[in-house]
């Protein structure tokens, strides 16, 4: 059999009319299989042309569900024709031998529509399968992200914490699960404590991996420090981290602030790489931006970072914020938002007060505590948001 031709089953009573009907169909280059019932039809049958009287009315629904079917009749008032049409068969034609060309066109069109419907059903089934697979992969990815976020939060220091009479606290709110923000503070000895505040470019898994590297390296470098020249520790860390990120070739850079507090001389030794917003120091009723500037860490090779220092009074509050905070503030320009942040900080004595004031400007921040774990019920923040506050010196360990 030529498989380029379609096989049409003609169901009608044997006789000259059935033969003529079959001949009219074969004129269009189609094969015809003639039968007087629907019991035995070839598997490759593409369409059925059935006479209204040749099929019992109780079999029309079975026929319609099996193959596309055209009904032919000798009269438009044929009761069997009406029953067949009510079942929902493809179409019908009266006096088919008088309208042989129309019959052939209807057959071709019905086969074409059936092929399109079958293709659509296959596409729908394939799409449902792909959607199910996608949902499964998304669920696994979500579980991985949640697990990664949990591990990342375990790497953060305990909060709040007092080190050598200086109070450290922070608010950590990832955009979704994993964050490109990170911070840490540690006691070196009775005289020195060190801390850092980082905002890795982007957010999500790749940025979070950089924070793990940062944690490992800073712990190692602090353990290797001999306790001499505290003013060199911060810029040396930034330069070393810059080389590490350059060497990884992962296309990530970071803004990074590193500070060393001398608890004997009440001095902050620090260095910074493209920190935005700038660290804000509140002391003696005044709010000032810490001086200094530096290039982003990991963006350019062979960068030297500044060695800076400032005196710390007996009572002070040092605030460090990631740039995600600016996304939560009103104002069309960066300067407007920075001034708004400075105003909120000047009015806040505790981290909770600043957070409450920020929540009044952004509804997402009011949807639950995001400090200890990401809140899966809230919408994603526009960016990772982290705030760190350092205050001293009068706190009891």
List the model feature ranges, each with a label.
Residues 113-133, 137:
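Flexible nucleotide-interacting loop at or near the entrance of a catalytic core
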Residues 1-14:
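Non-catalytic signal-transmission and effector/linker regions of two-component phosphorelay proteins
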Residues 49, 60-122:
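CheY-like receiver
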Residues 22-44, 50-59:
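A short, well-structured beta->alpha microelement
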Residues 128-318, 368, 373-397:
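… and, occasionally, acidic/histidine-rich disordered N-termini of signaling adaptors
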Residues 44-48, 90, 316, 323:
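Conserved acidic residues
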Residues 160, 232, 236, 288, ...:
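Catalytic cores and conserved motifs of cyclic dinucleotide signaling enzymes
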Residues 14-18, 210:
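Short acidic/polar segment at the start of the alpha1 helix of CheY-like receiver
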């Amino acid at each position: 059999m030529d498989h380029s031709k379609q096989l049409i089953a003609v169901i009608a009573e044997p006789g000259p009319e059935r033969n003529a009907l079959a001949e009219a169909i074969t004129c269009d280059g189609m094969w015809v299989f003639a039968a007087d019932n629907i019991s035995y039809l070839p598997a490759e049958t593409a369409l059925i042309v059935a006479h209204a009287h040749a099929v019992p009315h109780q079999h029309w629904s079975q026929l319609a569900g099996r193959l596309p079917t055209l009904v032919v009749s000798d009269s438009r008032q044929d009761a069997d024709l009406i029953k067949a049409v009510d079942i929902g068969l493809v179409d019908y034609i009266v006096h088919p031998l008088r309208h042989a060309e129309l019959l052939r066109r209807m057959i071709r069109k019905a086969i074409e529509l059936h092929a399109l419907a079958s293709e659509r059903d296959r596409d729908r089934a394939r799409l449902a399968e792909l959607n199910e697979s996608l949902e499964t992969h998304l669920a696994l990815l979500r579980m991985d992200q949640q697990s990664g976020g949990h591990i990342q939060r375990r790497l953060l220091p305990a909060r709040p914490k007092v080190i050598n009479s200086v109070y450290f606290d922070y608010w950590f709110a990832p955009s979704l699960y994993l964050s490109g923000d990170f911070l840490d503070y540690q006691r070196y000895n009775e005289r020195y404590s060190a801390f850092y505040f980082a905002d890795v470019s982007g957010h999500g898994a790749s940025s979070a991996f950089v924070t793990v590297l940062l944690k490992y390296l800073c712990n190692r470098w602090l353990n290797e420090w001999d306790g001499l020249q505290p003013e060199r520790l911060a810029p040396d860390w930034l330069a070393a981290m810059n080389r590490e990120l350059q060497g990884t070739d992962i296309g990530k850079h970071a803004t990074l602030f590193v500070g060393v507090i001398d608890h004997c001389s009440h001095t902050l030794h620090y260095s910074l790489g493209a920190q935005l917003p700038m660290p804000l120091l509140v002391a003696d009723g005044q709010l000032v931006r810490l001086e200094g500037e530096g290039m982003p860490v990991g963006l350019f090779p062979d960068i030297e970072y500044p060695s800076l220092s400032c005196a710390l009074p007996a009572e002070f509050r040092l605030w460090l914020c990631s740039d995600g905070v600016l996304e939560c503030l009103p104002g069309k320009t960066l300067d407007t938002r920075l001034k708004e942040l400075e105003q909120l900080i000047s009015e806040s004595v505790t981290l909770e007060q600043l957070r409450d004031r920020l929540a009044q400007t952004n509804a997402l921040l009011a949807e639950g505590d995001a400090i200890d774990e990401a809140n899966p019920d809230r919408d994603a923040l526009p960016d990772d948001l982290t705030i760190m506050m350092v205050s001293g010196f009068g706190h009891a360990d």
